[in-house]
Amino acid sequence: MRARANRARVAMGIRDPNSKMLESAWKAQELGYAQVVLVGIKKEIDKVGTELEVVDTDEPEKTLAELMISRKVDAAIRGTAKASGALAQLKEALGKKRICRLALLLTVDGTPFFLAPVGIDEGNTISDKLRMIKLGAEHIRRFGIEPRVGVLSGGRIGDIGRNKRVDRTLADGEFVTRRAVELGINAKHYTILIEDAIKESNFIVAPDGISGNLIFRTIAFLGGGDGLGASVLMDDYVFVDTSRVGGHFTKAIMLASALSHLNKERQKVIY
């Protein structure tokens, strides 16, 4: 509903275009979610064929960030632009060394939940995890949802002593959960029991970025679930990271448009 109410201009990065990805972008526009702007090499896009607006560039990663910062679009999604390049350009445009992403997924039975960290270089320290939990909780509240955080670690409490690395994740999980509660966030440490966490939580915190990325891929590409995209957590702009594997971007465009609407509503309240 928020996406249709907003119908934002959403830029989508394009590399190696094919009919499946362009049709998914067209579907988002046809359903009224957004006015979609494709960002990539125009002759390659035209060869596949589309009626969508195209910004011609051989550097979609850079152009996406420029369009977002200049506010020529209301939101952007990575699409099939290169991950490392797009995120590096985004950091440079924002003047930040690090960014946090929060993924929105659906399980095979349609249960929605948020997940972090999802980048292999994210969430590898206690301070990183706490920052993600704090920013993630604020982000989730913008949807009118009260976050319930499920912190995961590498084993059960009874496994302490079997492996030093597992022991470390268990200790970190206990500490992170305690600090989150002190910050006024509803959080619980579920150890390695993700199957229990998903029953009670709507925000899953993985032990590190590698395991978070594996959870995302397992659910979205092997387990019959769906990954809508991973929003970069920031106040002034909307950027949704996407995986090139699935090839479907309709829901990511819908998410970006909805987030743009929420940002505009929040700015009205602030000002």
Swiss-Prot record:
Keywords: Methyltransferase, Transferase. The gene is mtxX. It is an enzyme of class 2 (transferase). It comes from the Archaea. Its EC number is 2.1.1.-. One of its GO terms (biological process) is methylation. It comes from Methanosarcina barkeri (strain Fusaro / DSM 804). Belongs to the MtxX family. Coiled coil: none annotated. This is Putative methyltransferase mtx subunit X. The keyword Transferase applies. May be part of a complex composed of 3 subunits; MtxA, MtxH and MtxX. The keyword Methyltransferase applies. GO terms for molecular function: methyltransferase activity.
